[in-house]
Every structure is written in structure tokens, then in C-alpha cells.
């Protein structure tokens, strides 16, 4: 499974990769990096944060909503998009944009007691079972 992890928080990336899961994953900190990579590579899963700047937030920076629009406008292919942002309004906007375009989206605000890798595996297994019908 190839995963693109879009988040400016290095601690989340460390938590995500701590168990050395055998997936190819790549972290980017800014929307511009993500659009560049998505224009060149394909991913099975894209994990999206919304706010892409450590406080103080600069509203003029591209955010997860901008990336969701890019994904739709450029018809980026992936099996699952995970929205892990704690920003409820931003996550709701991304969810609306992506689901209206037909993407399989998992709304999963990242709380430290959740294991995002386990959630991703369950979603992958569910899709594999559905594809095999």
C-alpha cells in the first residue's frame, strides 16, 4: 500500500510510522509539495490534514480544502482518502468536496488514542472484500 501523508505536524508523522508498518509512505508539509507529488505519482491512500501551518495560522496559505479541490479538478486516482484533521469546519468542507466527486473518504479526526494505521487497514480490508463480490 502506497500512502501520501499530508500534514505539517511532524509528531503525527512519527506516530503514524512508529510501528514500522510495511507500507511505502511519504510525508509532505505543504499543499504545494502534495500537488507536485500527486502530479507525478499514484497513491493508494491519501491522508489529509486541513491546517498546513503551525500557529500562528496564516489564512493565505493553501490548506486541505485547496488540496481536495486539486484532487477533484485533476481527477487524482486513489482508493481511499482519510481526513484526519481536527479542524471540524475544514474537515467538513473537504468531505463535502471529495464525496460529491465520488471519492471513498474516511472521516477520521486524529485523536492520539486512535491508531490510524489500524483504521486504514480495516478500510482497505473492507474495500478488498467489497471488490471481490
Residue ranges and their predicted role:
Residues 1-133:
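Catalytic phosphate/metal-binding cores of nucleic-acid and nucleotide-processing enzymes, i.e., regions
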